Amino acid sequence: MSLIATVFSRLRQQNKKALIPFITAGDPDPTMTVPLMHELVQAGADIIELGVPFSDPMADGPTIQRSSERALKHHVGLKDVLAMVAEFRTSNMSTPVVLMGYANPVEAMGYAKFAAKAKECGVDGVLTVDYPPEECAEWVEHLRQQKLDAIFLLSPTTPQARIEQVAEMAQGYVYYVSLKGVTGASHLDLGEVASKLDQLRSHISIPIGVGFGIRDGATAKAVAGLADAVVVGSRIIEEIEKSPKTKVLASVGRLVKDLRSAIDEVSSKH
């Protein structure tokens, strides 16, 4: 069983839902990434999604685009991100880390080399935003050889055939993007999310995390009542962006603790 599957199994036994925060590696600067990862865990994160900076992050809204730009100013690339995970692993072996990014840096490194290096550094899963399931059998095979979970995005507009392909290929969890468009948008329709999750669960047996549009405890709590995991990215990046460097850890820690408390309120009632 993968570390991600182990975490979800433990949470199920505890009647809890997973909190999965996202940060971009190298934002606000490379020295802050590993301390931020530890802060996320102390504040209640179950799994960390770590973004690999990319110059053309087409699926991301302006907040996460800016975080990528800040990291790229410090020349943070895929090798640096893997080194950050390795550093995190020197003192945390139990919190899964999922790399989230785009295909280009992975292709530049090569599938086999990337998968081997990611495993060696302590990565648990990989979500490549711009790899549709129908085009990435070879990529997924390289991940599986290294016992890395291949994680996929689904959205309100994903066609049925692709949902079925994801159901066959995905491991760890599936990330359901609850809004059309780019990250950081608002206006989450919980009724629509509930109905879509019911549909997805008729095909997908692994946990489903919901993200995009979760900006506060109330929304996190509502989503936790529907999904297996709550994914929060843009709201955390905003906190990093607006806080002075000396206050970033405390500000992010406060936000994540609030989200954790809200999620646990609903989980404990089930």
What are these regions (language model features)?
Residues 1-11, 30, 55-66, 73-88, ...:
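Active-site-adjacent beta->alpha loops and helix N-cap segments on the catalytic face
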Residues 14-20, 92-102, 143-153, 201-211:
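Short beta-strand/loop segments at the ligand-binding rim of alpha/beta enzyme cores
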Residues 19-33, 98-110, 149-158:
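Active-site mouth loops of central-metabolism enzymes
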Residues 21, 40, 51, 118, ...:
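Conserved, mostly hydrophobic/aromatic
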Residues 30-40, 158-168, 210, 214-230:
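Catalytic cores of alpha/beta
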Residues 43, 121, 169, 203, ...:
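Structural motif
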Residues 45-56, 123-127, 132, 174-184, ...:
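Glycine-rich phosphate-binding active-site loops on the catalytic face of alpha/beta enzymes
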Residues 198-205, 215-270:
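Alpha/beta catalytic cores of nucleotide-metabolism and tRNA/nucleoside-modifying enzymes
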